[in-house]
Amino acid sequence: LRKLKLQLLKLKISTKIFWIVVTVFIISVCREPLFFLHPRIWAEEGVIHINSVLTNGLWGSLISPHLGYYSLFNNYVTSIGMKFFGLLGIAYVTTWMSFLVILLTVLSPLVLKSKFWDSDAKKITLILFLLIGGSAEIWLNTVNSQFYFCLFTALVFLSEPIEFNGWKWIYILFMMVNAVMTGITSAALAPFFIYKYLKSSTKSSKENFLVALLIFGACVQIYSLIYLKISSDISRFDISNIVNFPNGFYRNIVGILIFPGWVIHAILVLLIPIFLLNKEVRAVENSLPLIIAIYLSALFAFLSLGMHGGRRYSYPSSGLTFIFLLNLLSLKKVNTFTHLSTYIFLLIILYGAALRYFETKDVYDPEWKKFTLSNISELPENKLMLEVFPQWPNTNWAIIFSKEDLDKFKK
């Protein structure tokens, strides 16, 4: 009888997870079906990574750092995609691989255990925000997958010690290896993992591996930065842009408030200090998501183009701030005002995110030229050009290649 009850319980849990996954998939497709029906190549995916394959070859492009950091995920997805699917199918590869990263990040609360999402209601609420809280700019492109990787890494940090085996460990391992080797966003969390590791009284082999992996990833990214800084000019690290840093930091930290307008921003800036006056809220174990959010907001403002920050840089911080607010509802020594304010804020945040979720025309305009071989145009000196997204006025995102390249990668 006990075995039967356990089997029924497992079946119930599996059914619940199945419907959550199906719902997430449906909401994702409904955002803009054209992302899946007519995939596009986004900006640096074409200009940097596909051009790198054309210039350096499949293997050479795998080890090439770009734009100040090494990006394993972008490199191997583009290289493998070009090898087996060519120019005709590469957009499908980058789109679906990016979608896989989004799904594995958004659904991670179902696998990772943490006091910050220790109930079904918390898990579902968090999954919903992680899905609809990402701006359209970071949606379904490998270039911005680093921000999903960063949030996943933060969720691993906030979870209980890793004791998984089998597919769960493979899942975490796949995401973490890609995360620390794809941009600086995840490797930047290495100090937090080291701090947690040193404080832990029991250290498992998996925790040892994750800390070593993050340190290795940080070293790779620092080396890539130094190498590119010496060999080329990286304008994004121009210290003269420091005058933009305060505004960039502000844009990143209030990115969770999708609503425009200074009023809501001001309310959040005023309320969080009020929340922190409570001793239980102020405790490190409860305020940790907010601490990491502030750290990432500052770091990403410094590393962003012109230090202006922006919505794509705010996604990890927004997810962490949402977790901080969600956790306030579980604290017992918090007054009624804080609880009520938190409920209202969470509803405002979810409502605002839902409104913005379907605003995708700025990154996918149906009138823009599709990424198809029929839209290739000829240039002088036997060169060919294929435009990629975005096709905003006064921009020229395009892949330039030779007819020999077309013959080689035309599948």
Regions found by a protein language model. Name each.
Residues R2-S135, F164-K168, Y195, S205-I215, ...:
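Intrinsically disordered, polar/acidic, low-complexity terminal segments
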Residues L34-F36, S135-L140, T185-A190, S224-S231, ...:
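Short catalytic/ligand-binding loop motif for oxyanion handling, primarily in non-cytosolic enzymes
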Residues S71, S98-P161, M181-T182, W262-I264, ...:
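Membrane-interface micro-motifs in multi-pass membrane enzymes
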Residues V156-E160, L189-Y197, L271-L277, S318-V334:
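Transmembrane alpha-helices and membrane-interface helical segments
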Residues K168-F193:
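Membrane-interface alpha helices of multi-pass inner-membrane proteins
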Residues V220-I230, A301-F302, L355-E359:
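C-terminal TM-helix exit segments that contain a strictly Trp-centered aromatic cap at the helix terminus
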Residues S231-N241:
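Low-complexity repetitive segments in secreted/extracellular proteins
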Residues S232, P246-L325, A354:
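Alpha-helical transmembrane segments and terminal signal-anchor/GPI-anchor hydrophobic tails
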